[in-house]
Amino acid sequence: MVEWTDAERTAILGLWGKLNIDEIGPQALSRCLIVYPWTQRYFATFGNLSSPAAIMGNPKVAAHGRTVMGGLERAIKNMDNIKNTYAALSVMHSEKLHVDPDNFKLLADCITVCAAMKFGQAGFNADIQEAWQKFLAVVVSALCRQYH
């Protein structure tokens, strides 16, 4: 089990409270699909992913980005039990969707980049980043649990 300091909880919950999941989710997933084009193979049913403009304008990408952020909200609400909270999601991504677990880290990094761009140094300083990335590392670990 992960131990969270009061400062980490405050930083994570404070950042989460400022994030607009309808904005950050689509941006982060779009960025992931553009920067790491091999991740597109998991989204064959999403239609046109042929260019950055097509990806950024794709409503299915945007909707799934919001879904991803909804999943993060579940982790936020269950910070002391993320692994169990994500158990079924880990099984689904491993056994049904066959997602390469390395891609979870790539998407987490894209979420971090989008948050940093949105809030800049004032709203996303090193202390906030440290706590946020610890949180996302726990989420990624929970998603990868079924793969071990």
From Swiss-Prot:
Q: Where does heme b bind?
A: 64, 93
Q: Indicate the segments forming the Globin domain, all copies.
A: 3-148
Q: Could you tell me in which tissues this protein is expressed?
A: Red blood cells.
User: What Pfam families has UniProt attached to this entry?
Assistant: Globin
| GO BP of this protein | cellular oxidant detoxification; hemopoiesis; hydrogen peroxide catabolic process; oxygen transport
Checking Gene3D superfamilies in the record gives: Globins
Single GO MF annotation: oxygen carrier activity
Q: Which CDD domains match?
A: Hb-beta-like
Query: Can you tell me which family this protein belongs to?
Result: Belongs to the globin family.
Query: What is this protein identified as?
Result: Hemoglobin subunit beta-2
> Which species is the source of this protein?
Danio rerio (Zebrafish)
What gene is it encoded by? ba2
